Amino acid sequence: MKVKCTVSYDGTHFKGYQVQPGQRTVQTEIESALAKMHKQDELVPIVASGRTDSGVHAKGQVIHFDTPLSIPMERWPFALNSLLPDDIRVLKAEEVDESFHARFSVVSKEYRYKVSTETHQNVFTRQYACHFPYRLDADKMREAAGYLIGTHDFTSFCAANTEVQDKVREIYTLEWKNVSDGLEMRVRGNGFLYNMVRIIAGTLLEVGSGKFHPDEIKAMLAARNREAAGKTAPSHGLYLWEVFYDN
């Protein structure tokens, strides 16, 4: 039986999602919990929609795994959560067809990036939003965001050391919302390159602060050079919000 789970986690104290020897990761914790449920020494392998970096959070990460256990679907979250640390929670479990793949069946993803513009950093949210206490022109940020919507080569907006050859992606929506303590960027697309969302966020923050003009985004895209775009925003403001599949 193949099980699909929606998982939420606070990335603060993890060295990212993916297994790393000697490090605390989300994947390791979930696979360890599954091993206990299956009463075996070996980890039960899971597959995720994608990896997240150290410090990045997830509201709706999706994983799948195969199991011989005949536990009712509604009991899986309770069973797993009883074995998981408090900074990981399984929100939902459902049986899926054998053809489903948490990574390769993805149609689109939504990420959110939270920015606190308060004068003094809020000690209670310092790990969950990027603190940017400078004057921001949100209208210019929204104008610049418009140039990124659509299908583009995002070479300038991904880590220079990425091994991915095809850097063409499509962004469906990209908007900045006013929230109680600042701004929130919401972006949905068919796929994202390594550090792409954080580089977009960092660049648009620099547009808002006046370092770049909104229409300079067009030249950044055309340059296809990481050095043409702005800074990479800190990881702790980023959330994998939702993963979308057909049906």
From Swiss-Prot:
Substrate binds at residue 111. GO terms for molecular function: RNA binding; tRNA pseudouridine(38-40) synthase activity. It holds the Pfam family PseudoU_synth_1. CDD domains: PseudoU_synth_EcTruA. Its EC number is 5.4.99.12. The keyword tRNA processing applies. Keywords: Isomerase, tRNA processing. InterPro entries: PsdUridine_synth_cat_dom_sf (IPR020103), PsdUridine_synth_TruA (IPR001406), PsdUridine_synth_TruA_a/b_dom (IPR020097), PsdUridine_synth_TruA_C (IPR020095), TruA/RsuA/RluB/E/F_N (IPR020094). It is an enzyme of class 5 (isomerase). GO terms for biological process: tRNA pseudouridine synthesis. The active site is at 53 (nucleophile). HAMAP family: TruA. Homodimer. This is tRNA pseudouridine synthase A. The gene is truA.
